[in-house]
């Protein structure tokens, strides 16, 4: 706290005080009076401007050219206030001595908000010398500007109200605009409905002509429309609609029974006219086309053949008869994921984002519907099949969707190879190559009967290798594969292979030479 204790006395001079302090007075009483006046003025100025606690003798001056962080007096300061670097005590007293004991302070106070701004202003306030109160309790300016500094809570509430007004004012205007727009739209809609109703009610009358006053219909007018029908309806409704004929072209009022009778007459007339037209058409046809027995037999046999099976050969690669897919020798089915990074990453956790083809086993079922096929990635793949029983393979059938109903024929297989494995062999042997054509029928059978001598025993496993397709770079579709052959008998000798034929030929040649 501030006291009137002299500072420029003997003790300070003995402790190495600045020489400029000695010029404040010749003796201790004068020094005491001068330093007390100076401290009171400077203390009052500092507390009024920047709300700092009082000091004993001097305060550090704030200049606009030098910047320094605000001193920490354990009070709450706003973070947006910037303070300048203050002068030391010695520099302050040197300036005081040079300026003739006039305490002046240059204050530079800024803020980013709506706070007040003070730049290079001098404040000199009178001091009641007879008062022994503290420096900050002397005569102070009670204007609104100084009051805001003495009471920072008022200034904070002002800033808070300004903040809320600046934030919520656009929302308020937006709400008013929206309400006005909705009100205008509602009024226009109601006005349109009112105008349409008034226009429909006055459609028969021009807008510029007065509406005539039509008197209400009297009972005499109502009964004059058709008095006999009204009389019959009121006396006995069952009598109305007898066998008498009605003139319905006059536009008179009729009952429901009369209308039903008229409608029935019209329907009978239409039926009669239709029968006459059909009889005239039959009489105009000169003769009927009659087929002989040969043509009938040919058509029936052809239809029966294609209704049962167009190939008419046993299929040993049918899933329902015991054939199986060899997963280790079969390519993976086609899987398509999104191309973007985030959906592609998400597709590994959510299967709904992935497009997957059918399993390879669908190629062993007789289903020729569109898209009911086994699809694999790219244009090359293979399908390993374990036949339902060991056979001598003679034919292979490749089936694709009908060309007339296919969406895209570029995914059909083109070149393929057939590899086979005997019952006691561990190696697969190439049985032959072929090409599926798009210009021929959708079900094409290829013969491999001339290559049976390559394998000497019945075949259990086959591999169909697709080498290319008809232009689709993404996937290839295979609808159905059929493997045909002959079943070996129990006492039948196995067909000699090409190697066995060479060995037997060499043995016969050796016996002849001996």
Curated annotation (Swiss-Prot):
Pfam families: Sad1_UNC. Keywords: Cell cycle, Cell division, Cytoplasm, Cytoskeleton, Membrane, Microtubule, Mitosis, Nucleus, Phosphoprotein, Transmembrane, Transmembrane helix. Residues 1-27, 198-228, 490-514 are annotated as: Disordered. GO terms for biological process: cell division; centromere clustering at the mitotic interphase nuclear envelope; meiotic attachment of telomeric heterochromatin to spindle pole body; mitotic spindle pole body insertion into the nuclear envelope. The keyword Protein biosynthesis does not apply. The modification Phosphoserine is found at residue 236. One of its GO terms (cellular component) is Sad1-Kms1 LINC complex. Residues 322-488 form the SUN domain. Residues 505-514 have a biased composition (Polar residues). Its main location: cytoplasm. Signal peptide: none annotated. Residues 198-219 have a biased composition (Low complexity). It is a single-pass membrane protein. It comes from the Eukaryota. The chain crosses the membrane at residues 168-188. It is found in: Cytoplasm, Cytoskeleton, Microtubule organizing center, Spindle pole body; Nucleus membrane. Coiled coil: none annotated. GO terms for molecular function: protein-macromolecule adaptor activity; protein-membrane adaptor activity; spindle pole body-nuclear membrane anchor activity. The keyword Membrane applies. InterPro entries: SUN1-5, SUN_dom. Interacts with bqt1. The bqt1-bqt2-sad1 complex binds rap1. Also interacts with cdc31. Associates with the spindle pole body and maintains a functional interface between the nuclear membrane and the microtubule motor proteins. Involved in chromosome segregation during meiosis where it associates with the telomeres. This is Spindle pole body-associated protein sad1. It comes from Schizosaccharomyces pombe (strain 972 / ATCC 24843) (Fission yeast). The gene is sad1.
């Amino acid at each position: 706290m501030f006291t009137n204790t002299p500072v420029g006395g003997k003790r300070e001079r003995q402790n190495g005080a600045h020489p400029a302090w000695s010029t404040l007075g010749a003796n201790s009483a004068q020094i005491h009076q001068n330093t007390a006046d100076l401290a009171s003025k400077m203390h009052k100025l500092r507390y009024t401007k920047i709300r700092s606690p009082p000091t004993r003798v001097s305060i550090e001056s704030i200049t606009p050219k030098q910047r320094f962080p605000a001193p920490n007096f354990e009070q709450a300061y706003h973070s947006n206030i910037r303070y300048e670097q203050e002068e030391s005590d010695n520099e302050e007293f040197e300036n005081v001595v040079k300026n003739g004991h006039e305490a002046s302070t240059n204050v530079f106070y800024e803020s980013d908000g709506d706070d007040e701004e003070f730049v290079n202003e001098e404040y000199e306030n009178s001091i009641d010398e007879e008062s022994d109160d503290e420096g900050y309790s002397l005569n102070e300016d009670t204007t609104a500007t100084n009051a805001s500094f003495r009471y920072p809570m008022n200034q904070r509430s002002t800033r808070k109200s300004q903040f809320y007004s600046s934030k919520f004012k656009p929302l308020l205007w937006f709400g008013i605009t929206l309400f006005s727009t909705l009100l205008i739209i509602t009024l226009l809609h109601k006005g349109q409905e009112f105008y349409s109703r008034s226009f429909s009610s006055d459609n028969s009358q021009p807008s510029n002509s007065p509406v005539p006053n039509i008197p209400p219909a009297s009972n005499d007018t109502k009964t004059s429309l058709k008095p006999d029908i009204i009389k019959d309806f009121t006396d006995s409704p069952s009598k109305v609609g007898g066998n008498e004929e009605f003139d319905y072209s006059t536009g008179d009022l009729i009952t429901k029974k009369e209308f039903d009778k008229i409608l029935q007459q019209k329907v009978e007339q239409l039926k009669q006219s239709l029968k006459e037209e059909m009889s005239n058409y039959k009489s105009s046809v000169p003769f009927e086309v009659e087929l002989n027995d040969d043509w009938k037999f040919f058509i029936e046999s052809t239809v029966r053949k294609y209704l049962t099976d167009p190939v008419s050969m046993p299929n040993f690669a049918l899933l329902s008869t015991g054939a199986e897919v060899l997963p280790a020798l079969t390519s993976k089915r086609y899987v398509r994921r999104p191309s973007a990074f985030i959906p592609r990453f998400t597709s590994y956790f959510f299967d709904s984002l992935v497009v997957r083809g059918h399993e390879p086993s669908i190629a062993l079922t007789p289903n020729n519907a569109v898209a009911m096929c086994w699809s694999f990635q790219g244009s090359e793949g293979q399908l390993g099949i374990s036949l339902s029983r060991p056979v001598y393979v003679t034919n292979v059938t490749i089936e694709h969707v009908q060309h007339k109903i296919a969406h895209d024929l570029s995914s059909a297989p083109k070149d393929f190879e057939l590899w086979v494995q005997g019952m006691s062999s561990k190696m697969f042997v190439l049985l032959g190559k072929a090409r599926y054509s798009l210009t021929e029928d959708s079900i094409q059978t290829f013969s491999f009967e001339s290559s049976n001598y390559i394998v000497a025993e019945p075949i259990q496993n086959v591999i169909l290798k697709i080498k290319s397709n008809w232009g689709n770079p993404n996937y290839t579709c295979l609808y159905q594969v059929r493997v045909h052959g002959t079943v070996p008998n129990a006492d039948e000798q196995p067909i000699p292979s090409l190697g066995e034929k060479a060995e037997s030929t060499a043995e016969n040649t050796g016996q002849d030479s001996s």
